[in-house]
C-alpha cells in the first residue's frame, strides 16, 4: 500500500477515505478595511473564517446614490414583464461583474493558487453581500486580498479588497 518514500500508492480500485482532525481551530477574522473601488462601490471583508479545509469569506458592498442614478438612467427602473409589471433593480443588478470573479492574491497581485478548484470562488452574490469559498492554505502571505484575476499570474489591484490581517 505504501511506496518506498512512505507515501500512499494510488489505489487500483475502490474509494479513498481519510480522517479529518476536527480539533483544529477555526480562526475568525472580522471587520476588514473599507475601500472604495474604481466604480465608486465601497467594499470590505465583513468576516473570514479559516478552517482546516476551507476559507470562507463574506464581503459587504455599498452602491452609491450616484451609481444607482446612473444605472437607472441607462437601464430604466427595473425588469419589465410582458404584462407591464416592473420589478425594480436592486444593488445586485447594479454591481459590476467584478464581484463574481474575485480570487485570493498577495500584495503584488499574484494569485495564491494557479487555478481555483471545483466549488471555489464566488458562492453567491446578493444585494450588498457576496460570499466566497477557497481551499485552506497552510501558510498565507502577510497580507491577502480579494481581487479580480487578469492573467495567469496577475490581478487588478485597483479592485483589491484586503482581508483582515492574519495573525
Model regions and ranges:
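Alpha-helical, hydrophobic structural elements that either
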Residues: 1-167
Amino acid at each position: 500500500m505504501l511506496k518506498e518514500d512512505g507515501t500512499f500508492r494510488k489505489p487500483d480500485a475502490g474509494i479513498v477515505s481519510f480522517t479529518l482532525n476536527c480539533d483544529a481551530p477555526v480562526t475568525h477574522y472580522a471587520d476588514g478595511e473599507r475601500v472604495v473601488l474604481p466604480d465608486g462601490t465601497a467594499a470590505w471583508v465583513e468576516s473570514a473564517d479559516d478552517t482546516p479545509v476551507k476559507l470562507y469569506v463574506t464581503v459587504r458592498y455599498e452602491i452609491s446614490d450616484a451609481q444607482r442614478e446612473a444605472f437607472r438612467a441607462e437601464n430604466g427602473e427595473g425588469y419589465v414583464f410582458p404584462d407591464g409589471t416592473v420589478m425594480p433593480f436592486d444593488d445586485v443588478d447594479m454591481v459590476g461583474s467584478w464581484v463574481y470573479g474575485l480570487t485570493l492574491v498577495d500584495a503584488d497581485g499574484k494569485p495564491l493558487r494557479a487555478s481555483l478548484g471545483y466549488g471555489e470562488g464566488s458562492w453567491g452574490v446578493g444585494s450588498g453581500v457576496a460570499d466566497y469559498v477557497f481551499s485552506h492554505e497552510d501558510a498565507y502571505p502577510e497580507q491577502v486580498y480579494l481581487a479580480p484575476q487578469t492573467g495567469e499570474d496577475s490581478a487588478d489591484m485597483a479592485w483589491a479588497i484586503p482581508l483582515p490581517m492574519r495573525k
